[in-house]
Curated annotation (Swiss-Prot):
PANTHER family: OMEGA-6 FATTY ACID DESATURASE, CHLOROPLASTIC. Pathway: Lipid metabolism; polyunsaturated fatty acid biosynthesis. Keywords: Fatty acid biosynthesis, Fatty acid metabolism, Lipid biosynthesis, Lipid metabolism, Membrane, Oxidoreductase, Repeat, Transmembrane, Transmembrane helix. A motif (Histidine box-1) lies at residues 112-116. This is Delta(12) fatty acid desaturase. Belongs to the fatty acid desaturase type 1 family. Catalyzes the desaturation of oleic acid (Delta(9)-18:1) to linoleic acid (Delta(9), Delta(12)-18:2). A motif (Histidine box-3) lies at residues 339-343. GO terms for cellular component: membrane. It comes from Mortierella alpina. It is found in: Membrane. Its EC number is 1.14.19.6.
Amino acid sequence: MAPPNTIDAGLTQRHISTSAAPTSAKPAFERNYQLPEFTIKEIRECIPAHCFERSGLRGLCHVAIDLTWASLLFLAATQIDKFENPLIRYLAWPAYWIMQGIVCTGIWVLAHECGHQSFSTSKTLNNTVGWILHSMLLVPYHSWRISHSKHHKATGHMTKDQVFVPKTRSQVGLPPKENAAAAVQEEDMSVHLDEEAPIVTLFWMVIQFLFGWPAYLIMNASGQDYGRWTSHFHTYSPIFEPRNFFDIIISDLGVLAALGALIYASMQLSLLTVTKYYIVPYLFVNFWLVLITFLQHTDPKLPHYREGAWNFQRGALCTVDRSFGKFLDHMFHGIVHTHVAHHLFSQMPFYHAEEATYHLKKLLGEYYVYDPSPIVVAVWRSFRECRFVEDHGDVVFFKK
């Protein structure tokens, strides 16, 4: 069995020399990249049939477990302020925030399963459970389900993907590559970015990881450019079609109900209480969601495609599996270390994705991408080096 691809210390995307390879200073992986030629039929046939079987009972058991953990953590947090020792309180609250953020991220993932209809064979059960769970986390369920479906149908496509769409050379203010002055300006820009104070990079990372998720929902931050204001809460957003109107209304009502409950709790208890029990863990959920999805789709060695080269399976392979450690991988229901399988077959339930990944590795060989880098290293590398792609070309890679 071919070993999985690795990033940085060894990620290679089928390093095969061709006579057409340019002699520029492009990295070797970009010069020698060849398009994968797998069909979706042969990919599906390598996975055992039972991996596609869905169980509503099993899905509900996972929901019950996660909600039980969230409830127990909430009840434990009600005892924190009873400790007279301030040191215990100062340590216990962050512990609660971190753990509740992890658990609620797992709940978010289960709602995400519902949106893909991989939770059960019942569309009614899927949408009911998904709407409840996502509304609790201030996510417009159907709105995001629709845009996320479009993301899966066009992953890695420069003009059709819905999120983490790279900026182009012209969008970051660089002159055309053919311009003689472009090389000098690009080099100056690269030097500037390399010398950028780490604290500045860290600041923008914090902003993106804490507020990037609501910014995407509210104003389509990092999403596809539609040429006008776009929001998941707007019934006439260009993301949606007229037939989605009532789904958007239902989604908005779910979020409004959750916000109403939070406002009522703030009035009855206090804003500080709601902040400690809900808002801070909610920010941790935002952090995990953006971190996970950013790392899944952003790396210097992953290509993006334009219409001339894109197809579904090529786009689905433009994502990275990695591990956050056994505990987090378990709590996040495999969304991190089985993401390639998920993108190929989004209706496959998460509890079969690990077995499916085992078989996919054998078929895909070096086209299966796994990154063993420490998470901090991977984030820093992608954040600093993935700045833009070229304005032209069917296959483009990130530049810095």
